[in-house]
């Protein structure tokens, strides 16, 4: 893991930034270039990144880029179609953020521990202030239509509220 940190010396951070830029180019051999050029990490959460070619890069965003590229290349999803993505155990929503940027019309469902749902709701609201986000506290009916939302954030005990065969 290549860390850019306040705890490191300037020389160590410069060395790590150079390694991260090299890793970016190494990823270009296995990641769809359209996806690689699209990604940039969020400023929400005050994470440490390098600015390279106008993109905010860190190790995590490059890993998510690889995942998005693999999904894009192995699933027959139309980029502009409305479909439903579910990320179980997706943490604060970093990967879902990339998926939503690429598949703009999708509904993204995050199933996570209740404590982490709080972080995810903050992160996704900061990144998508104009998108409709359904929080688990707003789910009061088993027959809610989650496809009317851009994001649905729910704890794992509410996964039973997802209808069978509703995830693409």
Language-model-detected regions and their locations in the chain:
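Conserved SAM-binding loop of SAM-dependent methyltransferases across substrates and taxa
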Residues: 93-103
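A short acidic, Gly/Pro-enriched loop at the edge of an enzyme's catalytic core
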Residues: 160-168
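Conserved Class I S-adenosyl-L-methionine-dependent methyltransferase catalytic core
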Residues: 1-80
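Conserved class I S-adenosyl-L-methionine
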Residues: 80-91
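Class I SAM-dependent methyltransferase SAM/SAH-binding core
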Residues: 106-145
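Conserved SAM-binding strand-loop segment of SAM-dependent methyltransferases
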Residues: 148-156
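Short, solvent-exposed loop/turn segments at secondary-structure junctions
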Residues: 44, 91-93, 114-118, 158
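The AdoMet/dcAdoMet-binding core of the Class I SAM-like
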Residues: 1-14, 111-119, 123-124, 160
């Amino acid at each position: 893991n290549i860390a850019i940190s306040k705890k490191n010396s300037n020389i160590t951070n410069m060395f790590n930034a150079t390694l991260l830029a090299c890793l970016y180019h190494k990823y270009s051999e296995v990641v769809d270039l359209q996806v690689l050029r699209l990604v940039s990490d969020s400023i929400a959460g005050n994470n440490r990144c390098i600015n390279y070619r106008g993109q905010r890069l860190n190790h995590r965003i490059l890993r998510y880029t690889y995942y998005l590229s693999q999904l894009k290349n192995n699933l027959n999803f139309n980029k502009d179609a409305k479909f439903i993505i579910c990320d179980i155990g997706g943490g604060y929503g970093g990967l879902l953020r990339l998926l939503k940027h690429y598949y703009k019309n999708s509904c993204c469902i995050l199933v996570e521990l209740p404590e982490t749902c709080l972080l995810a709701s903050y992160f996704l609201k900061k990144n998508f202030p104009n998108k409709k986000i359904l929080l688990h506290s707003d789910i009061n009916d088993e027959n809610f239509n989650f496809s009317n939302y851009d994001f649905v954030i729910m704890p794992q005990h509410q996964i039973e509220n997802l209808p069978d065969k509703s995830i693409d």
